[in-house]
């Protein structure tokens, strides 16, 4: 399990945590992220995107805690997982702990099978099923690259994505 505990957010702090992951070949990945709003006017965004395939198991767990005295705090959690086959599993577990009023807190969690209509559309354009699945997977995982500028790191990310798809 990979755990990321963000520091307590002080007044006016803006924090983001973004993750993209691929669980495959009977691999099990668990990501736990937490953030604590400790004073007023703080902002946090957690975004998690992943794919489970080939008997892979992927779990995203996020906890956002807005403590008493943190008015005007804003926290949001987003998690999306595509499950490519019946042997694989995905779980998204957003947790919001709200101890004050006059705050904004929201979450969205989507775990679902590969959209057959998307697959059909690509195949109707002459793309093989394997290539169509690869294109969909790349579209899901590649956005993480926007957070990196180092060419070597980007090559490593591309290689990891290509090798797992």
Describe each region flagged by the PLM.
Residues 1-120, 124-127, 148, 152-165:
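Conserved beta-strand/loop scaffold segments within soluble protein domains that form the structured core
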Residues 140-150:
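Short arginine-rich
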């Amino acid at each position: 399990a990979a755990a990321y505990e963000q520091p307590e957010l002080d007044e006016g702090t803006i924090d983001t945590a973004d993750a993209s992951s691929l669980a495959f070949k009977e691999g099990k990945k668990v990501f736990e992220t937490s953030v604590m709003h400790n004073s007023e006017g703080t902002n946090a965004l957690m975004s998690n995107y992943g794919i489970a395939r080939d008997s892979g198991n992927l779990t995203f767990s996020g906890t956002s805690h807005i403590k008493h005295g943190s008015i005007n705090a804003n926290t949001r959690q987003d998690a999306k997982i595509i499950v490519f086959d019946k042997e694989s599993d995905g779980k998204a577990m957003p947790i919001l702990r709200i101890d004050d009023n006059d705050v904004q807190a929201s979450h969205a969690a989507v775990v679902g099978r590969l959209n057959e209509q998307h697959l059909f559309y690509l195949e109707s354009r002459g793309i093989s099923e394997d290539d169509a699945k690869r294109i969909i997977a790349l579209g899901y995982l590649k956005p993480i690259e926007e957070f990196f500028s180092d060419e070597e790191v980007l090559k490593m990310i591309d290689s990891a994505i290509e090798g797992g798809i």
